[in-house]
From Swiss-Prot:
Disulfide bonds: none annotated. It is found in: Endoplasmic reticulum membrane. It is a multi-pass membrane protein. It comes from the Eukaryota. GO terms for biological process: response to bacterium. It comes from Arabidopsis thaliana. The gene is RTNLB5. Residues 20-42 are annotated as: Disordered. Residues 68-253 form the Reticulon domain. This is Reticulon-like protein B5. The chain crosses the membrane at residues 78-98, 99-119, 173-193.
Amino acid sequence: MAEEIEKSVPTEESLMEKISEKIHHHDSSSSSESEYEKPDSPSAVKAKIYRMFGREKPVHKVLGGGKPADVFLWRDKKLSGAVLGVATAIWVLFELVEYHLLSLLCHISILALGGLFLWSNAHTLINKTSPQIPEIHVPEEAFLVVASSLRNELNQAFVILRSIALGRDLKKFLMVVVGLWIISVVGNWFNFLTLVYICFVILHTVPMLYEKHEDKVDPLAEKAMKELQKQYVVFDEKVLSKIPIASLKAKAKLG
């Protein structure tokens, strides 16, 4: 019996030692985890850096990703240069040479049909068989997807215009009015095709330059936005607050 008691005592002591070792190991691991968590605070501060338009994604993702974003950001310089060159050639053809779209389509159709007609007849004379020209048709699913997405965008635009027309957001109303006025002024300077070409060139230059210099542009944009907010507060206090919109809304509710 005495031997059994002596054997049980060391086992109990070993169990206590193991438990204490586990506790010390857990404390040390938790302290090490807390030490590792401390250096992460600067990254959290970096995440709060101001970005234009409040974006949280890279410029490539904002542009939709994929091939179009690669073209706009000049990831493939040959492809981007070719697209911009074709757009420039079209603009020069219609604006500087004053070539008309209907004439261009007719001339392209004449050349294409004439070439295919001569090639099919020559192929029949030489090979005694008619050439196989593939059938061209617009797929129904792709057309429906494009039409559905366009319908959704138009409905969303109508909802925004309706909310603005109801007078729910005066700030948004003023922004839309100013934007439409700027577009009307620019429309007097350029025709539609030139305006589209200018927008196309801007899409091929501004995002690429911004991506390269965003660390310099974003602080300047932050200062500009703060200044605009200050000016808007002053304008709101002196002008907008004096417009009796609240009383008109109250009368409308009572009526």
